[in-house]
Regions:
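A nucleotide-sugar donor-handling region in carbohydrate enzymes
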Residues: 129-195, 224
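Conserved nucleotide-sugar donor-binding subdomain of glycosyltransferases
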Residues: 69-109
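Catalytic binding pocket for nucleotide-activated donors in carbohydrate/polymer assembly enzymes
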Residues: 244-285
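Leloir-type glycosyltransferase catalytic cores
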Residues: 150, 157-160, 274-322
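Donor nucleotide-activated moiety binding/catalytic core segment of transferases
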Residues: 215-249, 255, 260-262
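Conserved catalytic-core segment of nucleotide-activated headgroup transferases in glycan assembly
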Residues: 19, 23, 174-220
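Conserved nucleotide-sugar phosphate-binding/catalytic loop shared by glycosyltransferases and other
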Residues: 3, 11-14, 29-79
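A short, glycine/small-residue-rich beta-strand->loop->alpha-helix junction that serves as a flexible
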Residues: 7-21
């Protein structure tokens, strides 16, 4: 019987913590003890949801030039990686969880070294990519599956066949109760960690008379979940998968405006599948066009939160190996 679960989320961007939170809350709702940590931009959101966390070294990849990247790697990335691996190993040894959930390579290494069962969480599969990004992800998956119990992928198409060793579940959303203190509005802009041109998008939409809010702007009040904001909007423009998940589970139309290669690959697949209430834009003009099509429309996405299915998959897998 699984009584104690540890979750370690990656520390780059808030999205990794965002998808860990619904999994942690679902385990906790079933009476399972949850220990969680990761650090970085998502740490405060985990705190807001009532979880205590260890103090872990964060790891960043930086450098605008080859020399800057090399200097950062030698003097920051490598030392930080060593410290994080050591800290996560010590923490897991102390916590003694029955199973670990993680998207952190150092946590996976630590779990393998400590002989702790673990599942890797992801939102990408090799079929999304061509010859550049597909092979490295395939190798990473193969190596992961030599040590992990499996890979669980949070997906906008959870019923599609999954690669061997992989289980698909629905989008993992920071779901909560809609809030009466947030008035309905037209457009929510969520630039994430890598978005660009969102200032221009807001200006152009407001010029056309739309009521627009931007995540993190001056009048933004951070809440434990995104549901009050995504549910109050007519449409959301965002970049990363965790923001997409928060939007579609709330039943709000979503315009995916990708920047990173992984974001673009996922957005292109979503566009090709003609998902209800979900569209892609790669230019500011196209964003404006898609927003105007969605505002006031009665065509909305219909997704259940994938957290219950995620936890079911973990518990079933652990029971099978017990």
């Amino acid at each position: 019987m699984t009584e104690h679960v540890a979750i370690v989320y990656w520390c780059d961007g808030a999205g990794h913590a965002a998808r860990a939170i619904p999994v942690a809350k679902e385990f906790r709702s079933r009476g399972v003890e949850v220990s969680i940590g990761g650090g970085g931009p998502g740490e405060r959101f985990v705190d807001l949801n009532g979880f205590e966390q260890p103090d872990l070294t964060t790891v960043t990849v930086e450098g605008a030039t080859p020399r800057a990247f090399l200097e950062h790697t030698l003097f920051d990335l490598v030392p930080s990686s060593v410290r994080r691996l050591r800290e996560v190993t010590t923490w897991l040894r102390t916590e003694k969880p029955d199973v670990l959930i993680t998207d952190d390579v150092f946590a996976g290494l630590a779990a393998a070294g400590l002989d702790i069962d673990f599942y890797r969480i992801d939102h990408l599969t090799t079929d999304l990519f061509g010859s550049i990004w597909g092979p490295p992800l395939a190798v990473y998956n193969q190596v992961s599956l030599r040590f992990a119990e499996g890979i669980i992928v949070t997906s906008l198409w959870p019923d599609d066949p999954a690669p061997e060793g992989t289980t698909r579940v629905g989008p993992l959303a920071q779901e909560g109760e809609a809030s009466d203190d947030i008035e309905p509005y037209d457009v929510l802009l969520n630039p994430g960690s890598h978005g660009d041109h969102f200032g221009e998008i807001r200006t152009r939409l407001e010029t056309r008379g739309y009521d627009v809010r931007t995540v993190g702007d001056d009048d933004w009040e951070t809440k434990p979940t995104m549901t009050p904001y995504t549910a109050a909007a007519d449409v959301v423009v965002c970049t990363g998968f965790s923001s997409i998940a928060d939007t579609v589970v709330a039943g709000t139309p979503c315009v995916i405006y990708p920047f990173l290669p992984f974001q673009r690959a996922l957005a292109e697949r979503a566009e090709a599948k003609h998902l209800t209430g979900v569209s892609m834009a790669t230019t500011v003009d196209r964003v404006i066009d898609r927003v105007e099509a969605h505002v006031g429309s009665d065509i909305t996405p219909d997704y259940d939160n994938g957290a219950p299915a995620f936890v079911d998959a973990v518990l079933a897998g652990i029971d099978d190996t017990a």
